C-alpha cells in the first residue's frame, strides 16, 4: 500500500494510489465469496471418479482459491491459508504435518532474506542514491533521460520490490515533469510526461524478472519445482535467463515508448541535470551506513552467483565439501543476520527489527499457500490426470504451446495478482507439459516470465497503479502504450526460451 506520506512527497493527493486506481469492488468480492464454493462443488461433482476423491477435492480447492484470489473476496494471504485448513479436513490421508512444511519451504527464506536486504537499502537510502546517480549520468536529452530513469528503476527492482522502486522514482520524475512545464512557459509536454511515467512503471515490472528475488512469481516457481519435481534453480542460473530478457526488453520498451508511442516534443531539458544533482546534494555525502549496506549487497550478489559455480568444480568441492550445502536461501538468511549484527555506530546497526517488521509477510504466506496447493496436485495424481487429458496435444509444436501459455498467463495477470495467477497455474501448466511429454520447465518458465509482463491496466500491477495515481497518465494512455508492450512481451518470452532458457536449464525445445 502506498502511504499518504509517500504520496505527499511525490506531490500526489492524500488518497492512496491503490484506492484511486482500484476502488473497493464490494459487489465483486461478495459475488466471488459465493461463487468460489459453488465452483468448487460443481467441479468436484463433474470430474470423473477415475480421478479419485483426492484429486477431485484438490481440483475443487484450487477452483475456490483461484476464484477468491481473482476477486479478492478475502485478503490474498488469507486465501493462501486455505490448504492448511481444508486439506487436513477433507483428505483423510493428509494431516497438518503434511501441509504446514510448505509454508516453511526453502524458497520462502530466500525471499525473506532478500526482503531484509532491500529494507536495509531503503533504511539507509542506498537505493535512492544509486538511482539518482544513474539518472544524473545520462545528460539532458529527454529521450535519454527517460532511458536513464528506466535503467535506474529496472536495476533497483532487481533487488527491491517493484512497488518500492516505483514510489522512490516517482517524486524525482514528477519534479522533472514540473521543470519541463516551467521551461515551456507553463505549457505541458504531454508526451514527455506520459512516456516518463510509463517508463518508470514498465521498467519496474521488466527489471524484476532478472533475479529470483525480484518478483514473487520467480520464487514461487523455484519452490514449486523443488517441492514437486526435484528441480533446483540457482540464483546465478536464473540470472542467465532473467538478465538478458530484462536488458533486451528495457531497450525495446524504451524505443517503443519514446520513438513511436509517445515521442517527446521537448528536444533538450536545460536544468534537468541540475535538479537531479540537487537531489543528490540534499542527500549529503555517502554515509557509513550506505557504504556498509553496499558492501553487504555486493557480497550477497557475488555469493548467490559464485558459490553454486564453485560447488560444481570438482577440485574446489572436494577441498570444501560444505559448499554444496550452501543454498541460495542459506546465503539470504546469512545476509539477513549479518545486517542485524553489523554496527553503523554505537546506537545503530544496519538493520533493526522496527524496520524489518515492515517485511511483506503476506507475500510469504502466499508462497506457502501456492506450494501447498501444488504439492497436492502432485500427491493426489491431479497433475498426472491433467497431463493425460491433454495427451491429444502431443503433436502440437512446442513453440505453439509456449506461445499459448504466455498469452493466456499475460492476459490473466492484467486482471489478477501475478503471484496468485502463478500459484494457481503452475501445477496446471506442469501437468500439461507432462501430458505432452515435455520437460516441465518448457512451459513453466514462460508462464512465470509472462506473469510479470502486465502493462495495460492500472489494476494489473502496483507500479501501474502508482504512476496512474500521479495524474500524468490516463487509462487510455496506459492502454495505448501497454498493448504494444504486451504483444512484444509474448515474443520476448519466446525469444528468451529459445535463446537462453534451453542452454541455462539444459532443456531441449
Positions of predicted regions on the chain:
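Long, highly hydrophobic alpha-helical transmembrane signal-anchor segments
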Residues: 83-88, 132-136, 140, 217-239
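Structural signature of hydrophobic alpha-helical transmembrane segments
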Residues: 50-60, 103-116, 166, 327-335, ...
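Membrane-embedded alpha-helical segments of transport systems
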Residues: 152-160, 169, 196-221, 237-257, ...
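Re-entrant/interfacial helical elements at transmembrane boundaries that shape
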Residues: 84, 163-178, 197, 210-227, ...
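C-terminal transmembrane helix pair
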Residues: 182-183, 243, 365-383, 394-509
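Hydrophobic transmembrane alpha-helices of multi-pass small-molecule transporters
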Residues: 1-110, 227-229, 237-388, 485-490, ...
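Alpha-helical transmembrane segments of multi-pass membrane proteins
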Residues: 111, 143-155, 182-207, 233-241, ...
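Membrane-embedded alpha-helical segments and adjacent helix-loop junctions characteristic
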Residues: 20-21, 64, 78, 82-185, ...
Amino acid at each position: 500500500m502506498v502511504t499518504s506520506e509517500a504520496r505527499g512527497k511525490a506531490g500526489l493527493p492524500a488518497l492512496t494510489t491503490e484506492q484511486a486506481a482500484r476502488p473497493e469492488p464490494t459487489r465483486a468480492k461478495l459475488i466471488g465469496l459465493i461463487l468460489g464454493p459453488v465452483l468448487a462443488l460443481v467441479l468436484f461433482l463433474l470430474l470423473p471418479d477415475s480421478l479419485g476423491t483426492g484429486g477431485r477435492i484438490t481440483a475443487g480447492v484450487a477452483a475456490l482459491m483461484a476464484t477468491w484470489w481473482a476477486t479478492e473476496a478475502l485478503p490474498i494471504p488469507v486465501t493462501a491459508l486455505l490448504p492448511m485448513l481444508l486439506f487436513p479436513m477433507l483428505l483423510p490421508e493428509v494431516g497438518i504435518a503434511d501441509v504446514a512444511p510448505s509454508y516453511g519451504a526453502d524458497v520462502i527464506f530466500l525471499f525473506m532474506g532478500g526482503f531484509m536486504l532491500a529494507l536495509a537499502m531503503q533504511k539507509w537510502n542506498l537505493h535512492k542514491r544509486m538511482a539518482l546517480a544513474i539518472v544524473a549520468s545520462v545528460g539532458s536529452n529527454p529521450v535519454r533521460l527517460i532511458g536513464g530513469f528506466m535503467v535506474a528503476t529496472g536495476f533497483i527492482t532487481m533487488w527491491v520490490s517493484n512497488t518500492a522502486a516505483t514510489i522512490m522514482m516517482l517524486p524525482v520524475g514528477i519534479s522533472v515533469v514540473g521543470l519541463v512545464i516551467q521551461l515551456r512557459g507553463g505549457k505541458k509536454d504531454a508526451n514527455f510526461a506520459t512516456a516518463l511515467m510509463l517508463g518508470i512503471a514498465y521498467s519496474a515490472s521488466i527489471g524484476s524478472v532478472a533475479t529470483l528475488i525480484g518478483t514473487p512469481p520467480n520464487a514461487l516457481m523455484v519452490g514449486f519445482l523443488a517441492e514437486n519435481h526435484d528441480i533446483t534453480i540457482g540464483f546465478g542460473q536464473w540470472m542467465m535467463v532473467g538478465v538478458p530478457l530484462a536488458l533486451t526488453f528495457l531497450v525495446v520498451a524504451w524505443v517503443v515508448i519514446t520513438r513511436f508511442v509517445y515521442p517527446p516534443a521537448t528536444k533538450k531539458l536545460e536544468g534537468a541535470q541540475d535538479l537531479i544533482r540537487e537531489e543528490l546534494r540534499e542527500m549529503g555525502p555517502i554515509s557509513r551506513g550506505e557504504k556498509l549496506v553496499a558492501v553487504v549487497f555486493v557480497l550477497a550478489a557475488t555469493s548467490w552467483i559464485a558459490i553454486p559455480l564453485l560447488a560444481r568444480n570438482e577440485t574446489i568441492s572436494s577441498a570444501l565439501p560444505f559448499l554444496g550445502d550452501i543454498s541460495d536461501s542459506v546465503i539470504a538468511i546469512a545476509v539477513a543476520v549479518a545486517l542485524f549484527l553489523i554496527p553503523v555506530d554505537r546506537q545503530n546497526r544496519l538493520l533493526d527489527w522496527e524496520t524489518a517488521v515492515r517485511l511483506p509477510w503476506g507475500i510469504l504466506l502466499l508462497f506457502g499457500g501456492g506450494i501447498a496447493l501444488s504439492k497436492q496436485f502432485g500427491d493426489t495424481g491431479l497433475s498426472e490426470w491433467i497431463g493425460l487429458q491433454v495427451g491429444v496435444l502431443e503433436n502440437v509444436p512446442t513453440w505453439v504451446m509456449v506461445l499459448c501459455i504466455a498469452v493466456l498467463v499475460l492476459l490473466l495477470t492484467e486482471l489478477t495478482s501475478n503471484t496468485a495467477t502463478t500459484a494457481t497455474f503452475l501445477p496446471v501448466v506442469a501437468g500439461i507439459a507432462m501430458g505432452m511429454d515435455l520437460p516441465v520447465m518448457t512451459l513453466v518458465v514462460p508462464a512465470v516470465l509472462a506473469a510479470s509482463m502486465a502493462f495495460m491496466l492500472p489494476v494489473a500491477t502496483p507500479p501501474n497503479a502508482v504512476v496512474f495515481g500521479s495524474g500524468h497518465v490516463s487509462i487510455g494512455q496506459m492502454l495505448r502504450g501497454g498493448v504494444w508492450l504486451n504483444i512484444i512481451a509474448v515474443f520476448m518470452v519466446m525469444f528468451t526460451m529459445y535463446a537462453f532458457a534451453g542452454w541455462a536449464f539444459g532443456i531441449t525445445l
